[in-house]
């Protein structure tokens, strides 16, 4: 094939630029929920010489300027200002759920400040409403972070919910996706595992062996 006919391919799913989450469980029920991040695209834009490993810019999760928004629009105060010996306030929420000592689920997500609401909504769907994670993950999500005073919603928000929120005076700000959860659910009756990747929002995969 002539070089002039070689074209760039079209990715089937957009690749995430920062945070990654994975959930793992073995045959004995030993579980790991791991969320790690560069924070923003290419992190600090500095690589460890000779390794190609990028360093993150998690310093932005501190209130670099208390009272002013960070890169995600979060406005924080003096309690989260940069000081020696402190760990910055992070939204990363790797989660393992158990009941009576038995593993029930493993989940987490990228998404900056939307991570906590993504994990909370999935946990409530599973625990409070008994919705399996393979049904809960594709459902629409919403997020509020105090400032701006608006509810971020996904474009797939049902029309009746959108109308009801607007009727109550909420300002809605739509975005293509919120979060990108990856999870494993344990059937409480059979103790079997169900791995679910949030493939409706971005690239991801559930695998078992």
Predicted features along the sequence, with ranges:
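Catalytic core segments in nucleotide and nucleic-acid processing enzymes
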Residues: 119
């Amino acid at each position: 094939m002539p070089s002039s006919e070689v074209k760039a391919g079209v990715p089937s799913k957009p690749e995430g630029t920062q945070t990654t989450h994975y959930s793992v469980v073995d045959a004995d029920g030993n579980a790991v929920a791991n969320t790690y991040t560069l924070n923003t695209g290419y992190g600090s834009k500095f690589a460890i010489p000779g390794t190609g490993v990028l360093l993150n810019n998690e310093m932005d999760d501190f209130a670099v300027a208390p009272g002013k928004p960070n890169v995600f629009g979060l406005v924080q105060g003096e309690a989260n200002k940069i000081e020696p010996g402190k760990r910055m306030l992070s939204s990363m929420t790797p989660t393992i759920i158990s009941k009576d000592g038995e593993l029930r689920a493993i989940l987490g997500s990228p998404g900056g400040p939307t991570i906590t609401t993504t994990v909370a909504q999935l946990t409530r769907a599973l625990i409070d409403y008994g919705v399996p994670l393979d049904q809960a993950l594709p459902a629409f999500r919403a997020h509020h972070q105090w400032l701006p005073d608006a509810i971020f919603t996904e474009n797939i928000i049902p029309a009746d919910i959108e109308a009801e929120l607007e009727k109550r005076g909420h300002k809605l700000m739509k975005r293509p996706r919120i979060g990108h959860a990856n999870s494993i659910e344990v059937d409480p009756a059979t103790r079997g595992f169900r791995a679910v990747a949030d493939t409706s929002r971005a690239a991801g995969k559930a695998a078992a062996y």
